[in-house]
Each structure stands twice: as structure tokens, then as C-alpha cells.
């Protein structure tokens, strides 16, 4: 309605029962009457006073603090946002990432959400979520634990702690970060409002990470909305047998990017140079051998004794070079001597350094 006629025009025609359908094409009488009842109950001065008492404010399009990326929603852009907290909404949104997921998450999901939240916060990112039970709450707590920046986007008023069990958490977020809502103070959540809330999370952030989600999940709604808006979409994989990871895996089969830690998220959505560290396994004693010693070790079979001459032929080195390397390998515990022959040390070192394979 606002997109069709503008906020001022809407307020002009709503109070008059004989008007509205003509000025607002496509509006049914029943729907228009519903909007009239809601408009009659509105008290802007009361709402502004209520949010001010919480140390908050109303941020509108065109304000200095308005996040311009919300304009990507087009006609679905929020008319305004109620904000509670001291931080600047626009500046925080410029470097923000959403972490969302299942309410009834597993311990694994809660651990991953908290770890991601903490890791992203330590890298200077603002973690945005919905303050729900499960993954949302774990992500917020992970950020708060390291003194980072987090924002909760609610499907109710900024003064309504929902869910009730997260009243303390939402209060901590308001003190350390931001609590954001489309509904005015006192507004209560409904099923439809959660869906509307999800689009704000998707548009506000540079990317969305999904940690555990079933096939029919509000988190996937957020991810798909983010995808349509050209934002990055990521997912944390889980067990193939877990129904709570089925939706994430479906996302990863499409356009989603698999991530397992904060550095991978930052590499995808961050600036040039925000690279995740190279993955390497543990450095084993075998890795420290020089190339010739490694060749001699590779030439030793799993079982039985082998002469120095046979090993030299297998390694492609001289007999003297081979013998010198065998003594080196013996001092390191890789091989043992028996008469004129050499064999791999048994049992193998517990670190798995001895060569695997052989003839």
C-alpha cells in the first residue's frame, strides 16, 4: 500500500470509510477495513516515546543511519526500522554476516554456530541472527563471549523479549550490540511476521550461513531470499543421516558454498586478502626426511630383510649413499639392521611415520 500511494497518501485516505479503494487500486474492502482498524490503534508519539525510553530510535529510508542495501528489496523494503542499541546501524550492516539455523538444533549445530559467531566477531564482522532458540541463540552467545558485535532482528517489537526464554540474551545483545525490528514497540510476533523478518536479515547482510536446517525451514527461506538478492549463501555440512542437515545439504548441492569455520566465511564475503589459511595435515617425522632418505625408505618392503645393494637398486642411488641413509634412518627409528640385511622397524612408530605400501 505504501509503495502504491506513499505513506502520506495512505494516512490521508485510511481514516475515511468512503475512500481508499479508488485511490488504492487492487485493494479489497475487507483488507482495507483491516488496515483502517490497525491505523486507528496506532499512536506514533507513544511508540517513539517507548523506544526512546529504551535508548532506541526509529530509522527511516533517507536517514543517515539507513542501510541502503535494504533498498534492494524494492517494494518489499521496510517502511522503517526500530533500533535499540548504541551502534550505528548503517556502518554495522556494511560488514555483517547472518548465521541462522534450526531451533531444535543438535549439540553439534550449537557448537558450530557459537564457534562461527565467535570467530567472525574476532575478525571484525557483525554477526546478525534472529535471537531464536537453537542456532540463532548459540551464534549470539558465541559473539558475546568474545566481546564482539552482534545484532538481533526480531519478528516483534524491540521491547518484546521473544522467545521469553531469551529475555536475558536479548537484553545482553541490546547492551553490546543492536536489536532491530519492523514492528513498533509492543508488537507481538506471528507466523507471517517471521517470514517478513527473514527478508530483512537476508538483505541487511553480505551473506547468510545456514547451520542445520530441515527441508522445510525458515532458515532456508532466508538463504533463498539472500540468493535472490545476490548475497553470498553458505552452509555448514552435517552428518548425511541427520534430518537436521538435509536442508543444508540440499542448499550445498545448488548455489550454496560449503564452509566449516569463520576464516572460510570471511574469505568468501570479505575484501581481497581475507584468505583462509592453507589446509595441512600434521607434520610427521617422515615429512622431515630429505628426498634421498625418503627414496631409500620407500624401497624397503613391508616384510623381510633386504640387502643394501637391493635397496640401492630400488632407490636409484649408489650403495654408499644408500648405506649412509640407512644409518640415518636407523638413528631415527625407521629401520633396523639384522646381519647384512635391513628391515622396517616393527612395530611401526605410533605417529604413522613409517612408509605405507611397498613390495
Spans of features found by a protein language model:
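N-terminal positively charged helical leader segments and presequences
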Residues: 1-79
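Glycine-biased, small-residue-rich flexible motifs in mid-sequence functional cores and linkers
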Residues: 54-359
